[in-house]
Amino acid sequence: MYEKIWNQNKIAFGGDYNPEQWDEATWEDDMRLFRLAHIDTVTLNVFSWAMLQPDESTYDFTKLDRIMELVKKNGLKVVLATSTGAHPAWMAHRYPEILRTEFNGMKRKFGGRHNSCPNSPVYRMYSARLAEKLAEHYKDYDNIVAWHISNEYGGECYCENCEKAFRVWLKKKYHTIEEVNRVWDTAFWGHTFYDWEEIVLPNLLSEHFAYERTMFQGISLDYRRFNSDSILECYRLEYEAVKRHTPDIPVTTNLMGFYKPLDYQKWAKYMDMVSWDNYPSNQDTPAQIALSHELMRGIGGGKPFLLMEQTPSVTNWLPYNALKRPGVMRLWSYQAVAHGADSVMFFQMRRSIGACEKYHGAIIDHVGNENTRVFREAAALGAELKALGDETLGARARKEAAILFDWDNWWAIEYSAGPSVLLKYRDEIQNYYTALYKQNMATDIIGVEDDFSDYRVIIAPVLYMVKPGVDEKIKAFVQAGGIFVTTFFSGYVDDHDLVVTGGYPGKLRDLLGIWVEESDALPEGETNHFTWKGARHEAVLLCDLLHLEGAEVLATYEEDFYAGMPVLTKKRYGAGAAYYVAVRSDALFYEALIREICEKAGITPVAQTPGGVEAVLRVGRDEKKEFLFLLNHEKIEQSVPVEQDATDLVTGMEWKKGSKLTLPAYGVAILKRSV
């Protein structure tokens, strides 16, 4: 049996509600509109710190009390935020030390958000105190279903507080200055430190010549880790504060998908449930959106997550803020549910009238009534989710194929001085995920600390950094019969970004049965080629020049001085096999490779669908039923063969094996069937 992640009897539907921005007459009309839209859950108090605490010693919850009672009276559940995402002006005025210093050394003044130094003792004290006051005040309010700590944690600070805290962090991690010198390789350029006070933080005033370009990768990598840990400590202080008074209410904070500055795999260990905000750009493909959902599900150990925010239609920060076409909001909401969401929440309930988010989408527009396209679409979706009830809550995905993703690896790759400015870790992950996605292969995104034994295939694109013990885990996985795939620029460094000497790919050399002698970085537009399985494919970005040490050649380069050298290899290892892909290639190659390795591993698509129809399978809480989500991302209707007797939970229609189910443009079906 699988458990629900929170105390809800349906997929929660609602989102960020900011009544403090409006008069109380508007509140009453909001309640009417919420009923029409089938809203059942609201996130309150996200940015109310200045209202709740007008000075150092005064806490005034009077208005929030009225709001909390109003939503309770109207049958709404509450996700209660702690309001610490933006500090009040009086605090910045009285304690300027709480203000962040930017990467270029510029000290901030009051304004914006993400504006507090995470290592300011004053900020930490006041934020934790507010969280505790809120929890103590509302501990007997029985309508809170979750705590929402701060909001979209992020950013970095480079102030004196942070520099001092960085030295403390280094002492705890490395113990001696000699070890710091070793792991940072400070003999290079005469950077040897003899005293902790000599260490300065890395920014544009010291080791960096651009935000992502550093002269000492080890220093910059550790500062990234330190910054993520520092902000995590702020979250944990508030987590502990609310748990002291409300131990049974789950606690989360809204993450942001592939957000580079924070190591969410580490953060998720301290979250009762993962939640995140999904704001794809106009150019993002369905596979890119799906990958972000998979990452968020993955960091939570495969449990369902909360979709805490999405826009009902437009965002406000893109160069061109296009409308979501009719049906797309519904489609993307169900896509989130298919990949593990147990909520469908929006920012925002009512569109604000001032500042930078006044043109961000909302359920209730500036016209202030229900007579808008967006409201009608939201209300229709709300009715469907109400009818769906608790059917899909707590459902899980089957474990078959996985892609390894690691934040430290991400940071290290893109801090690297070479081999190519075009090398982006997320792009390489996406290439392999898209090939799995297009073939409807069940895929998890896992970290290097996760259990590998449940999977048949593990793909680790650009596993540049091999942390201690990870090579042994991979070897054990393959030895036991697993199929492992990795690529160019893998196995080069340890967890300090120090090169593993003795030949690339370092500790993976024996497993892969190859030695990479050198690597050719191709400028944009320059292409080599190789032929595999009768099809000719591109070789771009990086071309590894490798020698065989027990592997077999599956394909070779066709051009340049390394024509005839291996580009794709395979080595049998124990009961399994390890593949090495020496280049970035084209979509058809990735699809062919995925098809071959999944066939060898006995992994089959969850459904056969035409192009543009996504199929996702989840197993119900009782493990006796499963749900096949069919999502048509195309502007035309498409038909899907029904492979097993099923009931469509969206329409209520019964479908027999062998029949054809027609999905309209942007249409959705959820086929419930026996396992």
What do these predicted regions represent?
Residues 1-43, 54, 69-73, 77, ...:
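N-terminal carbohydrate-binding accessory modules
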Residues 9-11, 38-40, 72-78, 140-145, ...:
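Short, well-ordered coil/turn segments that N-cap beta-strands
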Residues 12-22, 47-62, 109-128, 150-157, ...:
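The substrate-binding groove and active-site-proximal loops of carbohydrate-active enzymes
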Residues 15, 34, 42, 71, ...:
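Conserved, mostly hydrophobic/aromatic
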Residues 22-36, 127-133, 256-266, 325-333:
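Short, acidic/polar
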Residues 29-35, 43-106, 238-245:
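Aromatic-lined substrate-binding rim segments of carbohydrate-active enzymes
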Residues 105-273, 277-291:
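Polysaccharide-binding and catalytic clefts of secreted carbohydrate-active enzymes
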Residues 199-203, 248, 257, 268, ...:
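Carbohydrate-binding surfaces of carbohydrate-active enzymes
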